[in-house]
Amino acid sequence: MLTTGLQPSIAAGRLVFARVSASRGADLFHMRLPQAGADPGTPQGLQESPANDVDPALSPDGTLLAYSLGNQGNTEVILRTYPAATDRWQVSSGGGASPVWSPRGDALYYRTISGPIMRVDVRKTATVTLGTPRLVQRPSRLVARVGYDVSPDGKRLLMVEEITGDGGRGTSVTVAQNWFAAFRK
């Protein structure tokens, strides 16, 4: 096993994840992904603070890290340089969580506290410039904490929403085993 933690994000040969402890809350850790057969080493603390740091999302090129920072009942999406935190920007205002990068790394999506998904353009030159948050989608209710992602072509949001109006019966899942053998017949 490489390590234990929650909400892994992988890019550019690096792994960033959250760990929860009873004494500190949630903190972010990171490590280099090992080559086959090599010792993975020990995860290092990346973002350790009294606040809860969760939902890490590495940019596709591995130079920026977005995450949710929970402090005294308020959660915001933060963007910082990676691995060294030389610069830091607040992406959301009025509450935000669950950041997800576009495949090209030119936009960051996040959920507001009330549910809508926002998009912020990210321009990287000598510095990082953030655009104005724009409403993208108002999902009825996402099933998981993150519960959405951006399609590989960057043109669509893919999400898992709760089905409403089923009278509380829940959702059934059908598992088809050995379907390929049946298909060949």
Go through the PLM ranges and name each one:
Residues 1-20, 48-68, 89-109, 141-156:
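Conserved beta-propeller blade repeats
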Residues 1-6, 31-54, 79-97, 122-143, ...:
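Multi-bladed beta-propeller domains
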Residues 149-185:
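Blade-level signature of beta-propeller repeat domains, shared across WD40, Kelch, NHL, RCC1
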Residues 26-28, 41, 75-77, 115-117, ...:
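Repetitive beta-architecture junctions, highlighting loop-to-beta-strand starts
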Residues 12-23, 29-34, 47, 57-60, ...:
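Beta-strand C-termini and the immediately following turn/loop, strongest in propeller blades
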